[in-house]
A protein has these predicted regions:
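Structural transition elements
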Residues: 223, 353-393, 410-417
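Detector for C-terminal structural segments
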Residues: 14, 229, 339-370, 414-423, ...
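Gly/Pro-rich hinge or "lid" segments in bacterial periplasmic/extracellular proteins
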Residues: 83-87, 187-252, 256-258
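Extracellular/periplasmic solute-recognition and catalytic clefts
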Residues: 145-148, 152-154, 226-237, 258-324, ...
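N-terminal lobe/hinge region of extracytoplasmic solute-binding protein
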Residues: 49-105, 218
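Aromatic- and charge-enriched surface segment that lines or borders ligand/interaction sites
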Residues: 99-149, 181, 271-274, 326
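Surface-exposed binding/hinge segments that line
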Residues: 113, 130-132, 143-204, 227-229
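Ligand/substrate-recognition segments at binding pockets and active sites
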Residues: 392-464
Length: 567
């Protein structure tokens, strides 16, 4: 699972402020009449103002493209997201590799060939063994936190503990210095998407310093780390051994990028609005505009020109534990679905500029294959009468009381404010909600363990890559249920037909063919009312008046820092 940076990686329809340039960006600078020229965009210092991030910067411990777009400025991977605005930006493209990989054996084997001329920031060549070593170290217990897919997908991955004790993962083969082959336990047509994860970044074994590596990593991207203060500061300068001749996806316009983390969103937005000093050439990769700025957008044309809008493939929802009463009865689950007032939920998170109502689990967009459905139509404000009718059929004519768990922090978009909106809506239907607020630190631990999981909880799911698989598999595949903790299949669904369809879709290596199958599966599962979709978040982000080509990409739902330039 990937969470939004400020909310906790996606694709859906994107609205850009300005016209997309041929290079794949947009002249979003607003205050300049000069068009953005990707051939002449070098120079200057870009400032990045963030709320979160920078807690980790080791490619092994980052979760997919965690930390926004920043890691991909230092770490190249076998594949990467296509660096363009719009729907085309939801597809993977080759990065270190010459292509998206050659599948065989029903997508259980994937072969990649590295490009010529690849170099680390010290000038040494990058080879297939460097990529393998980078992947292997991500299995080390000393470097936790990365995406779990390789542990599950690679043969022997579940028991492998990394290379520090001399072990070798035999399911990754390097027959020569440019070839790397992956042997998987089961078919996975999405492997080219997974190969964008930072775990696929090459690491030279001779320069691996273990847990200290993030302080001075060896770069394969356009920038190298000059300074890293965990959780606070990151300064990037040019890697002189990188060039666009070997990397056609990263424009890498600024000479220097200075990132500050740990700022309050209100402070970030105030600094971006005022744009004094270095803040004139600043962006954020995790702070949506606040109420004050939203109110000004309609009346302040100059500010409106410095906003980009988009979405991240994410759904906020109510989760049922269908093994616990009263939610073992589908009529009770349906009653909750009818009772929900989505308009009040959207108002709680800032209004329609920042959220759109959801009746499907999959977000909008061709990449996900969403098929529109609304099996329990309640309109914008809910249907408490229909909910009461269903409760009566289920034997709860006098209503019932339920506990609702939620994190005690509103920044992720499913905290106390949303819980209050849900509580009020259910009250209208005769359902009394007992709020159960948990700390951010405890929330995933409690809700992710079946033995401690509350019957009803607020949850969020975001796309690790823009496709239906990483949305549906963790939530609905019965073989993904983890009794000891870390479980995301909160409904505890274990339907052989669903599991079989997941396996069949996983064999498909053409994303365009797989997408409608994922959409159809979502539509079929939705009939069981295993969860109640609430809303899909939107991004509305400011950028400084001296920033150009700041567009929100459709993979992660934030600015693509690799494409931004400063005046």
């Amino acid at each position: 699972m990937r969470l939004r940076p400020t909310l906790l990686l996606g694709a859906a329809l994107l609205t850009l402020v300005t016209t997309v340039a041929a290079c794949g960006g947009s002249d979003s600078g607003g205050s300049s009449s000069a068009a953005f020229d990707p051939k002449n965009c070098q120079g200057g210092t870009l400032t990045v103002l963030n709320e979160s991030g920078l807690a980790k910067f080791d490619p092994a411990t980052l979760y997919t493209s965690g930390g926004g777009a920043l890691p991909s400025l230092v770490y190249r991977t076998l594949t990467t997201r296509k660096r363009v605005a719009g729907e085309a930006g939801t597809t993977p493209v080759p990065d270190l590799a010459t292509d998206l990989g050659t599948p065989s054996d029903d997508a259980k084997t994937w072969k990649y060939t590295l490009k010529d001329g690849l170099k680390f920031d010290d000038g040494t060549p990058i080879g297939s063994k460097d990529v393998k070593y980078g992947i292997q170290r991500s299995f080390s217990p000393d470097l936790p936190g990365g995406a779990p897919y390789l542990h599950d997908w690679l043969i022997g991955g579940a028991d492998y503990k990394g290379p520090y004790n001399g072990g070798d993962l035999e399911s990754i083969e390097t027959p020569d210095n440019r070839t790397i082959i992956f042997k998987l336990r089961q078919p996975h047509g999405d492997f080219p998407y997974l190969a964008t994860a930072t775990q696929f970044a090459p690491v030279p074994k001779a320069k691996d310093t273990g847990t200290k590596y993030q302080n001075a990593p060896v770069s394969s991207g356009p920038y190298k780390v000059e300074k890293y203060e965990q959780g606070k500061k990151l300064i990037l300068t040019r890697n002189t051994h990188w060039s666009r001749a070997v990397d056609d996806q990263r424009l890498a316009c600024p000479d220097r990028i200075e990132v500050t983390s740990g700022l309050e969103p209100t402070v970030i937005n105030q600094r971006l609005v005022s744009g004094s000093g270095a803040d004139a050439k600043a962006i954020t990769t995790d702070a949506n505009v606040g109420p004050e700025q939203l109110a000004r957008l309609g009346s302040d044309p100059s500010l409106s020109k410095r906003v980009s809008r988009g979405v991240f493939g994410e759904t906020k929802y109510l989760a049922f534990d269908t093994t616990k009463k009263p939610f073992d009865d589908v009529r009770v689950r349906q009653a909750v679905a009818y009772a929900i007032n989505r308009q009040s939920v959207i108002n709680a998170v800032g209004g329609s500029s920042l959220a759109s109502p959801a009746t499907t689990f999959l977000p909008e967009g061709k990449a996900f294959g969403q098929q529109r459905y609304d099996y329990f139509p309640a309109g914008e404000t809910g249907d408490p009468a229909k909910a009461r009718e269903l409760l009566k059929q289920a034997g709860y004519a006098g209503g019932l009381a339920v506990e609702l768990a939620f994190p005690n922090y509103d920044g992720d978009g499913y905290g106390p404010k949303v819980a209050a909106a849900v509580q009020d809506a259910l009250k209208q239907a005769g359902i009394t909600v007992k709020p159960k607020s948990l700390s951010e630190e405890d929330y995933r631990t409690v809700t992710g363990k079946p033995a401690t999981q509350p019957p009803l909880s607020l949850q969020s799911w975001g796309a690790d890559w823009p496709a239906g698989g990483p949305f549906l598999i963790p939530i609905f595949d019965g073989r993904q249920i983890l009794k000891e903790g870390g479980n995301y299949n909160l409904a505890q669904l274990n339907d052989p037909a669903v599991n079989k369809e997941i396996d069949e879709i996983n064999k498909i290596t053409d994303a365009a063919q797989a997408a409608p199958r994922w959409g159809a599966l979502d539509a079929e599962i939705g009939k069981q009312a295993l969860l109640v979709p609430l809303y899909h978040p939107k991004t509305v982000a400011l950028f400084g008046k001296g920033v150009k080509n700041a567009y929100v990409d459709e993979w992660r739902g934030w600015y693509d820092v690799a494409s931004v330039s400063v005046k």
